[in-house]
A protein has these predicted regions:
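Conserved acidic, metal-coordinating active-site core of Asp-based
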Residues: 115-150
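Structural alpha/beta surface segment adjacent to cysteine/selenocysteine redox centers
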Residues: 22-129
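Single conserved hydrophobic/aromatic residue that forms the stacking wall/gate
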Residues: 148-159
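Conserved redox-active cysteine motifs that mediate thiol-disulfide chemistry
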Residues: 13-23
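Extreme N-terminus of proteins, especially the signal/transit-peptide cleavage junction
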Residues: 1-5, 33
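Short active-site neighborhood of thiol/selenol oxidoreductases, capturing the structured segment around
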Residues: 4-14
Length: 159
């Protein structure tokens, strides 16, 4: 008999540890296939709700918020990339130089849950930011991620 686990996954699309946690959770569920099924719901958490629309240089941000030196930041990026690779997710650290406000991405994820496409959109947003180096606050990026999930983008409004 399969047990269904309802999981509220609180995360931000600009958090590398969130995609690492999600991939690890998915792998664990795959290992327990037939025994456990996930009923996964993403809940919003903005890491940087006060972030301006222009974003901020990621090195500056990490130094200001966490006191990280450039050497510490580099070592952390290497650890994140290695952990992501082990879980089948590609971090392209050289493509990602800024951190952005993710409020509109969370708004779109809320809409996507109502349409039944939230997991695919969440994955597309993580990939857009961490693999492709795209700005998750840019509405064109959000529409491209939405198109990945197949519904008509005319159904979602970000105004």
């Amino acid at each position: 008999m399969t047990t269904t686990l309802k999981i509220d996954f609180v995360s931000d699309v600009s958090c590398p540890w969130c995609i690492i946690g999600l991939k690890a959770l998915e792998q664990a569920a795959d290992r327990l296939q037939g025994e456990v099924a996930l009923d996964l719901h993403f809940q919003p958490f903005e890491l940087n709700p006060q972030m301006g629309p222009e974003g901020q240089d990621i090195g500056e941000h990490l130094q200001e918020k966490y006191g990280a030196t450039p050497e510490q930041s580099q070592k952390n990026r290497e650890a994140i990339a290695a952990r992501g690779a082990a879980l089948g997710f590609t971090f392209s650290m050289d493509k990602r130089s800024r951190i952005y406000n993710t409020f509109d991405a969370h708004r779109l994820l809320h809409w996507a849950e109502e349409k039944g496409v939230q997991p695919a959109l969440k994955e597309a947003l993580f990939t857009a930011y961490f693999t492709d180096g795209q700005d998750p606050s840019n509405h064109e990026v959000l529409v491209r991620c939405l198109l990945y999930t197949s519904p008509s983008p005319r159904d979602a409004t970000l105004s």
